[in-house]
Amino acid sequence: MELKSTALGKHLAQHPYNRVQLLNAGVNVSGDRHEYLIPFNQLLAIRCKKGLIWGELEFELPESKVVRLHGTEWQETQQFYRHLFKAWQSWSQEMSDVSSAVLQRLVDEISEQEHRDGWFSRQALMRVQQEIRAGFAALPLPLARLNEFDACRDNYQQCLCWLEQGEAKRQQANQRWTQTTLVAQRAFFDTVESSPLNPSQCQAVVNGENAVLVLAGAGSGKTSVLVARAAWLLHRGEASPQQILLLAFGRQAAEEMNSRIRERLDTDDVRAMTFHALALHIIQQCSRKVPVISRLETDGVYRREFLSRHWQQQCDEKKTQAKGWRQWLTEELEWTLPEGNFWQDSVLASRLAGRLERWLGLMRMQGGTQSEMLALADDETRPLFQQRLRLMAPLLKAWKKALKDEGAVDFSGLIHQAVNYLDKGRFVSPWHHILVDEFQDISPQRARLLEALRRQSPESSLFAVGDDWQAIYRFSGAELTLTTAFEQHFGEGAQCILDTTYRFNHRIGEIANRFIQQNPAQLKKTLNSLRDGDKKSVVLLEQEQLDALLDKMSGYVTPEARILILARYHHLRPEVLDKAQTRWPNLHLDFMTIHASKGQQADYVIVLGLHEGRDGFPAPVRESVLEAVLLPRPEPYPDAEERRLLYVALTRAKHQVWLLYSRDEPSIFVDDLHQLGVPMPRKPG
């Protein structure tokens, strides 16, 4: 069937189209020079209009496009329109049945996902939305027409809602499921650890995102959450023991976690290991030779002697090296050196050994060539950094030769080699769930190992437990932004906060939390205490009052109570402790640095050394150019890491903290704490 413009109508209209032909499932609109084929599946509306004399047909298409035919005889136009409209409506009804079936399938899939007994992850939402878009693309009807049909309207709107508001609906589904699950699985959460898990711990354990960061404040039960997470995966059948990997930063922490797993899960098949043990395992699986860890890594005294000896040797053999080292130590570190062959001074060599150890460790951790390391420095720093690299180069060469002669590897080499095996596909990761403790201490090198493992299996999940408020290891390469910008590095996921501490009272928590959050870059979180405290829970005291304080404590502290005495440096250990066993025989006193106290707790804590100066707290910035380039970029907030270090010290205590300061040169932290309401009595109360 065809409709044409009249001769006069065609002449007067001067329009590109003058005829329309009805096809099997569409129309063909054409003119002398133009032709437009419009299938019914692109047609949104057909309109028949009457002008002054002639008829007009309008075909509405997507994206507001309209094709018009002018100059047709009016009665013929009406007749053609009725026939066309009937054919179009008949086709549309048939296609609406097809569309209805597709939409019903999509809605059924959405409902199944929304109400399944499990976590609704971001990845699952992406798959649902991809299915909806694919389903829409396969529909025979234009989307804009679906609301016309009763069989399609509601399901189409539901699909559309999941495209536009999917994240909100996903969160609602997870909230419902979590509430139901915590009630249904109460017996599990009450018995999986020695004490029942609290709601925030339970919510972290059941979170099934592919990347989960659990912010675990001091004393909030992070190890319980890690153990419970592994148990939950097994309990739910989401993983076999061999598919779960737990990672800790130190051997002792890994052993403690394994002990907890054996005790609570009654299995040896789920194992915690250090990053170095993981790298060693990967290399062993890919090589016939079992790697030997060098004595340079396992024996600290031997390592420092090795570095001192080779440093002295290079200064002996090359005057230019000796001159360069003199310049470095005097100008940058402000050390006073003896005249002449300063490198032969055994005290100086011993003092420098620790620095050489750290600098070489950073170079080994970075890996790559000298030119690759140079590229890390900015234009202003590069010339001096290059000089320092040249001075360190003989030590690096001697280190590598010693490893080769020993047929051994160091820890940095282990991780570099493991990442290389993973990237080349020589090792296929069996782990679908990676659980990491103390995540705030992770370095870029270790993060690369995690990323390499996850690239092997895009569906693998990362469950990271840490606390950016306790990040105190930048000097050894830890990168805080791997925690504070977690999603940028490890993908979109979820952040959970453990909101209850079982260690310190409310007053200690209040002071510590307000003190640490004076730095706006720290992640915001609430940490509630179960016990109240009073103003005496945190006290500023002059450092001369230490003896008087211990005298006072000996009158009421029980022998079972632990008193932790903390300082920024080892050499600040007070001499009074040498006579403590006889003067205060019933006081359980332990001294350590604040860094060493991480993970410890005590009934009472005494923090020493809140004074200004070279060994002050906060410590003055004394980074060499080598550290400035190879370590993660410093934070803009003043003394950010030192502030976190004092937070760690404060939060070791259960009942009471005394902060001892210098009256003549008080630390800037003293004023900060006093303004937060910490009292400054003249004598111990």
Please annotate each region the language model reported.
Residues 1-19:
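Anionic N-terminal interaction surfaces
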Residues 16-18, 23, 30-37, 44-52, ...:
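P-loop NTPase Walker
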Residues 127, 136, 140-218, 224, ...:
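Conserved helicase NTPase motor core
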Residues 135, 143-176, 181-182, 234-408:
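A basic/glycine-biased coupling hinge at the interface between accessory DNA-binding modules
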Residues 210, 240-243, 268, 458-460, ...:
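Short glycine-/polar-rich loops that comprise or flank the Walker A/P-loop
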Residues 213-214, 220-226, 492-494, 501-587:
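Helicase P-loop NTPase motor core
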Residues 433, 558-560, 588, 598-663, ...:
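Conserved helicase C-terminal RecA-like lobe
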Residues 447-535, 680-681:
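Conserved RecA-like helicase ATPase core segment
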